[in-house]
Amino acid sequence: MVLSGEGTATPKLADGQVEAIRVIKIARNTAVKAHTTAMITLKAVLVTAPDDLREQLEPLTDHQLILACAELDRSGNIADPAVAIRHSLASLARRYLDLHEEIRIHSNHLKQLTTAAAPQMLERFGVGFDTAAEMLITAGDNTDRVRSEAAFAKLCGACPIPAGSGKTSGRHRLNRGGNRQANAALYRVVIVRMRWHPPTIAYVERRTAEGLSKKDIIRCLKRFVARELYQLLPEPSNPPEAQIAA
């Protein structure tokens, strides 16, 4: 439909603060993945380390392990496996620390940008800067392109899909479409609220008594959160004027 010129959907604009949030979040997400990979790889290398080094490092916490590995002596003949392992552990640990600092910088930028773009959204229970960023990215800079909260829920993959048949009615199933990152963000909000938010806890108890499964209750709650957050999206005609330092 898009290539034929017959599409009716309004495309996202990429000229505002939400686009800045999107590209910063891409950098942060890739850094987080690399950060996790560095720790997993370091522990895998440690398994094959010499016994004395492994016995020294294995009891440490993750934070202590990273700091200890970063200070390992890397001098010696690199052809010696023991030296090569120390070199590898030190390199992975320093990479982990560098990525940790990079993630901190990206997170600070995202917090500032989302606070400037949608401060009311961040005040809602269970909504952090990462969730707010996903909601803003899903809607785009021109939030008026999403005509209704139902359309926004569909974008987030949170709208109900009828699953009835000739023998059943009123049943729905999970929506596997939409923006899966936004759907995951809604899921995190719901899980937090199911544990700590009294109105949500009461809702879960009531719906459970009515015979709904936990999966169906979560589906209903994601739809509610999508409706709630849609109403807090910023107006496209009034972009924030806050200046964010790089």
Where are these regions (language model features)?
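Phosphate-backbone recognition surface of nucleic-acid-processing proteins
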Residues: 122-123, 129-210, 214, 242-243
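Basic, amphipathic alpha-helical segments enriched in Lys/Arg and hydrophobic/aromatic residues
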Residues: 208-245
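Glycine-rich, often acidic, oxyanion-interacting loops/wings at catalytic, nucleic-acid
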Residues: 20-120
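Short alpha-helix plus adjacent loop in nuclease-associated cores
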Residues: 1-15, 19, 60-71, 168-177
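Amphipathic alpha-helical segments in well-ordered regions
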Residues: 45, 185, 189, 224-232
